A protein has these predicted regions:
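Internal alpha-helical scaffold of NAD(P)-dependent oxidoreductase catalytic cores
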Residues: 1-77
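Interdomain hinge/lid region at the active-site interface
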Residues: 62-109
Length: 109
């Protein structure tokens, strides 16, 4: 994902795209800051919040022998660098809260 800011130049954006192509990136997209924040808020940050919530809402040490791949995936996601995630959540707070509210609206329907 290439995100343009007010400091970005066309040449700089093209250079970043060419680097992605040289590295054989499968998808190279240019998004606005708002599009990026919305997508990351939903796909990454909301997912992380849900994973952490599931890992902390119930003592699950006695359930370890019964877990499947999806639960193990959630524990892996929940354990990722909490200091980094805290900073990312604060930087994208408004969008993350919006995504949480949308999720909860659908959940309770």
């Amino acid at each position: 994902i290439i995100t343009s800011t007010v400091k970005s130049t066309l040449m700089g954006m093209k250079t970043v795209e060419q680097i992605g192509e040289a590295l054989n990136f499968k998808n190279i997209s240019t998004l606005t800051v708002e599009e990026h924040d919305e997508m990351i808020g939903f796909l990454s940050q909301l997912t992380h919040c849900i994973a952490v919530s599931l890992m902390t809402c119930k003592e699950s040490s006695d359930l370890v022998d019964y877990t499947g791949d999806s639960f193990r995936d959630l524990t892996r996601i929940a354990r990722i660098n909490e200091n980094m995630w805290s900073e990312l959540f604060l930087l994208n707070k408004e969008e993350l809260l919006l995504q949480m509210n949308l999720f909860l609206e659908r959940y309770f329907k």
